[in-house]
Amino acid sequence: MNSSIVLLPGDGIGPEIVEQARLVLVKVAERFGHTFDFSSHQIGGIAIDETGDPLPQPTIDACRNAAAILLGAVGGPKWDDPSAKTRPEAGLLKIRKELGLFANLRPIKLFDELADASPLRADIVKGTDILFFRELTGGIYFGESGTSGSGEEETAFQSMTYSVGEVKRIVRMAAQAARGRSNRLTSVDKANVLEPSRLWRRVAAEVMANEFPDVQYDVVLVDSMAMHLINRPSEFDVVVTGNMFGDILTDEASMLPGSLGMLPSASLGDGGPGLYEPIHGSAPDIAGKSVANPLATILAAAMMLRHSLGLTDEAEAIEKAVAGVITDGLRTPDLARGDQSKSVSTEEMGAAVVAKLAS
């Protein structure tokens, strides 16, 4: 297979971690007989510095023509001026819109060897392996908003809307993923209070009954789900939910493995290139120090192979290699915790994954 991959290193530690993921992909191409053509483009703060735009047109054009996109991170205190005309994060929002990316996939997987890094007891969190599907382009974040009145009478509002089509496409995508895992799907809503959630629940149930009768399906209210993630996270597999609920629940769930440095994500649409990235930020305080954890970005590259390029065996090879270096006891400082004698650098961790792929 010959595929074009756009790299968007971005700001802070972005260039360091994207480079390690690129080296892993080079090894995958060598091992499995593929050709990956990489091109690097600007996004975020560095793009503002160079062009005045957090997402320059050449970056948009390159992304549209690529098979997939791998992003590092954007933002940092350098660009936090509230009076600035634009911010680095605007580039990320714009690229999602330009590419029509409506589904955010976030796997929450705990490696058994890292159970002691979780804030929860090992017996509660062990075995956690959840894949969240969050709807990205509808819901309250994109509803009509405004204010009226003044003083004590000042009022603000934000409307929450979902269409049948928006619900159908995200539920279908999640159900397809469930078929490739344990055949279980949980939909999260607030149908006891919110009208859009009632539509969500009705449409989701129709899709599951008519198109995925083989998938075990249940529904959970969002407040109950917030509790379940703390007291029994290992009981869930694939979870689908709306924009705001997904935003909150995935941030909560991201704490389960104990480090953001282990968690990748993907943003997908109907065909076209997907966008893959670690969930952590640009961490400017450690940029250039070779201590950033590249594993989330490497795992994002595995997601890219699976979801955009259809290379399941290759994705599994990367995931197996990452599991292998963790089993071997290699830890970047965020994972080593108090025992820094176990810690390795960004480059050493990346090289260890490459070595596993070569063996």
Swiss-Prot record:
Its main location: cytoplasm. Its cofactor is Mg(2+); Mn(2+). Pfam families: Iso_dh. NAD(+) binds at residues 76-89, 281-293. One of its GO terms (molecular function) is magnesium ion binding. Keywords: Amino-acid biosynthesis, Branched-chain amino acid biosynthesis, Cytoplasm, Leucine biosynthesis, Magnesium, Manganese, Metal-binding, NAD, Oxidoreductase. Catalyzes the oxidation of 3-carboxy-2-hydroxy-4-methylpentanoate (3-isopropylmalate) to 3-carboxy-4-methyl-2-oxopentanoate. The product decarboxylates to 4-methyl-2 oxopentanoate. This is 3-isopropylmalate dehydrogenase. It comes from Rhodopirellula baltica (strain DSM 10527 / NCIMB 13988 / SH1).
